[in-house]
Amino acid sequence: MTAPPLVRSPEVAEATAAGRAIVALESTIITHGMPYPQNLETARRVEAEVRAAGAVPATIAVMDGAIHVGLDDARLEDLARTPDAMKLSRADMAACLAAGRTGATTVAATMICAHLAGIETFATGGIGGVHRGAETSFDISADLQELARTPVTVVAAGAKAILDLPKTLEVLETFGVPVIAFGQNDFPAFWSRASGLQAPLRMDTAAEVARAHRMRGALGLSGGQLVANPIPAEAEIPREAIVPVIEAALADATAAGIAAKAVTPYLLDRIFRLTGGRSLEANIALVLNNARLAAAIANSLVTGH
C-alpha cells in the first residue's frame, strides 16, 4: 500500500517527535470563509492562540500534490491569496492530490488528514450538518459521517446556525457521535451561545473531554467527539437578533438558485453584509475561543491530567 503524500512542517515534525500537544486547524475558513487579508490575519491569530495555550498549531491544506500538516508563513500567505482553491471533503481529496491542485480542507477532510498525521484534537469554527430542506434536497454535510468514523475530537461552536440544528443533532445521535456541550447544558448555535436545544452531554473541563476521548479508544469505538464550545458572551449575536437575518439570507439563496457546496459560502457572505460585518467579528472570536479549548484538550491528552 502506498504511503499517503503527507508533509509535516518543521514545527509540527519537531512537536510530533517530542510528543508535544498538537492542534489541527482547517483551511476552508482561509479560502472560503473570509476575504484577503482578513483571512490571513485570522489564520495567524488562531495559530498564535494555540501556541499561547501551550500547543503547536497544524493548519492543514493540500498543496503541490501533498497534504501539508502545518504551514509556514509563506505557504499560509499563498493559500490566503489562492482564489480557486478546491473545497475538499472525503469525496474529492484524492482527486485534488492526484491532479496537483490546491485544496482547502473542510472539517471532514481535516479530520482525515489529522488522523493520518497522528493528531487527535482539531479546532474549527462550526461543523457542517443537515441543511434546511434536507428532507427534499438530501443536502447533509459529510462532516457528520466523518465524526462517526474518524477518531479525532473536534472543538466547534456547535454547527453553523444556518443549518437545521434539530435534524443535525438527530443525525449525530444516529451515527453514535458524542455531542458534548462545554460548560453549559444548551447546544450552542455558532454566533449565539444558546440554540434552545439541550445537548446530549455536558463537560466542564478539558481533562474530562480528554478522558472520554481515551476511553472511546479503549472501547474500540470508531469516530470522534464533537465538543460544542459556546462563543464568548461578549462576542455573541443573540439568537433573537440573528434568526431574522438567517431567514432573510436563506430566502435570498433560494431566490438566486444557490445549491450544493455553494450554499454555505453564499449564506455566510450574505449574513456578513446583512449584519454590517458583525457576523465575521463573532466568527473570529469563536474560532479563537475554540483554539484555546482545543489546545487545553490536546495538552490533557499528552499529560494525562
What are these regions (language model features)?
Residues 1-19:
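N- or domain-start disorder-to-order transition segments that initiate the globular core
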Residues 14-17, 22-23, 112-116, 121-123, ...:
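Solvent-exposed alpha-helices and their adjacent loops that cap or buttress functional pockets
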Residues 23-25, 57-62, 103, 121-126, ...:
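General beta-strand structural signal in soluble alpha/beta enzymes
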Residues 27, 32-34, 40-97, 218-234, ...:
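Glycine-rich nucleotide/cofactor/substrate-binding loop typically near the N-terminus or early
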Residues 73-148:
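Divalent-metal (Mg2+/Mn2+/Ca2+)-assisted nucleotide/phosphate chemistry catalytic cores
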Residues 106, 135-173, 207-211:
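Active-site glycine-rich loop that binds ribose-phosphate moieties when present
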Residues 193-218:
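Anionic-ligand binding region
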Residues 221-289:
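A C-terminal functional module that forms or caps the active site or interfaces directly
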